[in-house]
């Protein structure tokens, strides 16, 4: 069927990363080792040095392809909340409606496609109130808690962060 053509993303390797990013192979191996082992990493540096550029290419190099569908980026700010990140009630014309947030939707997508790695990139992570944004999910992002289910604040639903979700903060 013509409508169901599979999208083929370009290959992206360690070699491509090292060519695109000013980093030694030793530093790259250390960085990917920590991220793959811990599932979460914080990239640190002055504004404008290319952390976003590095984060996306790091994800692509681990996936082996430039699959933009498996990489999601959000930017935290002082007003960013649990309701934006996980889920919360939002006003509608007829009252309030429970809306799912960016991280919730991303994790559900990754859960369905458990054979592939997914990368959630958080820009300006230091500007958000992490306890307020992550809420009860703070412990679920730890490597040894991946796959463990927890009851969500605004829903009877159980939620887990899949083992194939990696978080890159900066």
Indicate residue ranges for each PLM-predicted region.
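AAA+ P-loop NTPase catalytic core and its hallmark functional loops
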Residues: 1-170
């Amino acid at each position: 069927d013509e409508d169901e053509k599979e999208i083929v993303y370009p290959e992206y390797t360690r070699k491509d990363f090292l060519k695109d990013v000013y980093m030694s192979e030793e530093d790259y191996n250390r960085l990917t080792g920590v991220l793959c082992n811990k599932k979460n990493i914080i990239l640190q540096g002055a504004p404008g040095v290319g952390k976003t550029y590095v984060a996306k290419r790091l994800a692509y190099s681990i996936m082996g392809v430039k699959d933009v569908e498996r990489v999601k980026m959000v930017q935290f700010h002082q007003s960013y909340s649990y309701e934006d990140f996980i889920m919360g009630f939002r006003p509608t014309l007829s009252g309030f409606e429970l809306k799912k947030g960016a991280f919730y939707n991303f994790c559900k997508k990754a859960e369905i496609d458990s054979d592939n790695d997914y990368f959630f990139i958080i820009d300006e992570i230091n500007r958000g109130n992490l306890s307020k944004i992550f809420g009860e999910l703070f412990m679920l992002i730890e490597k040894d808690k991946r796959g463990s289910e927890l009851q969500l604040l605004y829903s009877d639903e159980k939620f887990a962060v899949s083992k194939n979700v990696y978080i890159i903060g900066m």
